[in-house]
Every structure is written in structure tokens, then in C-alpha cells.
Amino acid sequence: MIQTQTVLDVADNSGARRVMCIKVLGGSHRRYASIGDVIKVSVKEAIPRGKVKKGQVLKAVVVRTRKGVRRQDGSLIRFDGNAAVLLNNQEQPIGTRIFGPVTRELRGEKFMKIISLAPEVL
């Protein structure tokens, strides 16, 4: 459950390290985002010579949450932290590598690129 002001780790090599959610996209008064949802983020911490700079406002897709995701068979997949992958305006990933596992829930038409780059799909 990601909401406004939540700080997330970045799970790609775009150059950002930590981002803060500033808006949950998809609905006029939507409060929470979970795995697979697109959010608007502000870069809070970035490495030098990265593709993105501190203070930049971008879109991101949530790939891991502490809350987890419930499957049809009743199992719950939970992670140690909240993480997102940064997207450009066409909703394609900015980075060329993904770090850490991602879930099968991202397997829609929009995020197949993230699934193919990820080292592990749960």
C-alpha cells in the first residue's frame, strides 16, 4: 500500500536511489497504490552522472511492497521493502537493468519489458 509521501527504493539503473510518491494515478481521489500501479514520483536521492537528477518528477510503476499481493490460490507474496521502476512519458522503463525480484502481476501488456529485464519473477 503506497500512498502520497511514501518513500520507495528504485529497482533499476536509471541513477535514482530513492523516490517519494507525490500522487497515485488512476482515479480522482485514489489513496493507495499496490504492485503494478503507476504513481507520480519525485527523485529524492540520485547518483552522480545518472540518467535522472534529484528533484525530477517522473512516473513509476510499483514492483515490490511490504504489504504484498494476494494470489488466487490464497498465497501471499511479501517483500522486505517498497520499490519502484522509473518510467518515461511513454511508460517505458528509463533504466536498462532491473534489480531484485518482481511479481507475475506485472505481466500485463504495458510492463512486459520489466518482466523480461528482471532477474527473477515470482
Swiss-Prot record:
SMART domains: Ribosomal_L14. Keywords: Ribonucleoprotein, Ribosomal protein, RNA-binding, rRNA-binding. Belongs to the universal ribosomal protein uL14 family. Binds to 23S rRNA. Forms part of two intersubunit bridges in the 70S ribosome. InterPro entries: Ribosomal_uL14 (IPR000218), Ribosomal_uL14_bac-type (IPR005745), Ribosomal_uL14_CS (IPR019972), Ribosomal_uL14_sf (IPR036853). One of its GO terms (molecular function) is large ribosomal subunit rRNA binding. This is Large ribosomal subunit protein uL14. GO terms for cellular component: cytosolic large ribosomal subunit. The gene is rplN. Part of the 50S ribosomal subunit. Forms a cluster with proteins L3 and L19. In the 70S ribosome, L14 and L19 interact and together make contacts with the 16S rRNA in bridges B5 and B8. GO terms for biological process: translation. CDD domains: Ribosomal_uL14 (cd00337). It comes from Hahella chejuensis (strain KCTC 2396).
